[in-house]
């Protein structure tokens, strides 16, 4: 009975595969939104002020960072929790694929969130005259919370790796 339960539990990981397919559809939606924004920028390029252009470009950078985050989560999550990805033609394979464990993925996600938040905060500061002070304070507090969380996660991973190395040295 125990073996049947274990086999079922192990195979149940495939129930999560549609989530990664859904995230890849989210990547498609993000790509469409990116080109929609480009379509809105290009015809008006000469009418836009420098500040407006920079704000719109920051928005595109935001979309690109979110897209990169999605790709990381889709590939790493699929490979860590579902199955190894057998990509034919090693030239095409991403160098980090298969090398990122759940802990590293969490840290990369946290760093990406900080980068996205930084870009957004830069956009807020460029449009400062239209942002109420109390809202600005919350943007900064939220950003600092992301930065602090990413720092703590990185520090904890460093401690964890150091502890694992010490345990291996003591056993070997």
Curated annotation (Swiss-Prot):
Localization: Cell membrane
Task: Offer one Pfam family short name for this entry.
Answer: UPF0114
Q: Could you tell me the superkingdom of the organism this chain comes from?
A: Bacteria
Q: Which GO terms describe its cellular component?
A: plasma membrane
Q: Alphabetically list the UniProt keywords.
A: Cell membrane, Membrane, Transmembrane, Transmembrane helix
Cysteine pairings via disulfide bonds: none
Q: Does the keyword Cell membrane apply?
A: yes
The record lists the membrane-crossing segments as 15-35, 57-77, 108-128, 136-156
Q: State the annotated membrane topology for this chain.
A: Multi-pass membrane protein
Q: Which family does it belong to?
A: Belongs to the UPF0114 family.
Name the record gives this protein:
UPF0114 protein PMI3225
Native organism: Proteus mirabilis (strain HI4320)
């Amino acid at each position: 009975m125990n073996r049947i339960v274990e086999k079922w539990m192990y195979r149940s990981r495939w129930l999560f595969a549609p989530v990664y397919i859904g995230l890849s559809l989210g990547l498609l939606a993000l790509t469409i939104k990116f080109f929609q924004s480009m379509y809105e920028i290009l015809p008006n390029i000469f009418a836009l002020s420098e500040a407006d252009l920079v704000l719109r470009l920051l928005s595109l950078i935001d979309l690109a960072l979110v897209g990169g985050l999605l790709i990381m989560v889709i590939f790493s999550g699929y490979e860590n929790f579902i199955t190894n990805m057998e990509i034919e033609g090693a030239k095409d394979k991403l160098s980090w694929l298969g090398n990122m464990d759940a802990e590293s993925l969490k840290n990369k996600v946290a760093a990406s969130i900080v980068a996205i938040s930084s870009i957004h905060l830069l956009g807020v500061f460029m449009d400062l005259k239209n942002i109420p002070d109390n809202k600005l304070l919350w943007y900064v507090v939220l950003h600092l919370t992301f930065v602090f969380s990413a720092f703590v996660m990185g520090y904890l991973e460093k401690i964890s790796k150091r502890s694992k190395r010490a345990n291996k040295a003591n056993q070997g």
